[in-house]
Amino acid sequence: MTKVSKDKLSKYKELDKAAFEFENVKVKKFFDRSNLEGYSLDTTGFLANPGFFQAPHHREATSENDIAFVGCPLDLGAIGLSGARHGPKAMREGSRNYGPMNDVTGEIPFEQCNIIDYGDVEWSCTNLDVRVSEDIPLVFESLSSKGLNTLSCGGEHTTTYGVLKGLSTGHDDSFGLIQLDAHCDTMSTWGGDTINDGSVFRQAVLDGYIDPERTVQIGIRGRANFLWEFSHDTGMTVITADEVFEKGVEYVI
């Protein structure tokens, strides 16, 4: 067994002088700026701001903001799968112990753009169609008109229809779509409802929000494949889960 030399110990003690401080210059600069702006960040997770990745909460978004995180806590249309409404809360809670630096790239997103947590969509009533066709689009249309990019979190799949409708307002072109999912969600009515948890992207095509020929559905699997004929008939690119495993990520990209 070899004892550590005095020279090495001295070196280690020099490195230790910055203990409990942010030795990374990039991170220190970020935290210093946050403190100067009166916005203190917690690294322990116990006292963390409840915003997504501790982003500041701003209900009145402006053109100075670049990205807004928006929660859509809804699961009225997910028959037998209630609980998806807790998604936004869980995402915020789970993000508290991460950041501010991306551990792979070494970049700090909050230094590259102005990010806010808008909060959750407020529901005007308990009716699913109204929430999806009116409440959600209203929020995303407003944010889009101010030039913000949005990151939405559901909630069940029907929330995506509302997001697409809101973002489409004021745009002449239909969106291209990359969908990572187990199901295509292009079935017809379910229980008499045109917009439901399994028909989101069928209805989005019919209403002109997405272009099926520029839509790619990745990871499709399960016993309900016979319900997704609309995807194939309209020209969507459907890549099954088996294809992903057999051919790899590079093939998918």
State where each predicted segment sits.
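Conserved alpha-helical scaffold segments that buttress catalytic/binding sites
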Residues: T2-I253
